[in-house]
Amino acid sequence: MKILLGISGSSSVHLGLKLLENLEKKAKVFCIITEGAKLSFEAENKKKLDKICKKRFKKVVFFEDNDLKAAVSSGSFGIKKTIIAPCSISTLAKIHAGISDTLLTRACAVALKEQKKLILGVREMPLSFLSLEQMTKLSSQGVCIAPPIYASYSGVKDLEDLENFIVGKWLNLLKIKHNLFKKWD
């Protein structure tokens, strides 16, 4: 199964990387990382994201966000599920407005027109009325809005447990089995 992971410019890029680490084991993964995500990651970690990705993810196919001719820009390429995690408010707004000026937003437009699974891990707080309205409209079109919110019922003990819960919930939405947190009995 072909899955596209987009990581867009906001804090918590490391959650996208943790998701990528888990996806790489279970599916054919294609990844687009926006310039904003790279800048956020480098500001938070003092490391270059491109170098880390090339070393860590050998099976993942990476595309530049400005490469509008890339295979994932076409519905005929066969991406079955798309997730953006984290998803910036800017990316959310572009998807809502149908603006396809980057590879990531084009790939989301394809997911919408092809009626494929599209999940947005919107990472912002507080949320404006406009962003809430955009999420509501996208949800009414079948888009799954799945912000990175944790729950304490899963036996959370530390930050890694919180991150595992969030990534595990995203994997659940993608119908990918995992052992990142204890399921509710």
Language-model features: where?
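A cross-family phosphate/adenosyl-ligand binding-site feature
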Residues: 1-119, 124-185
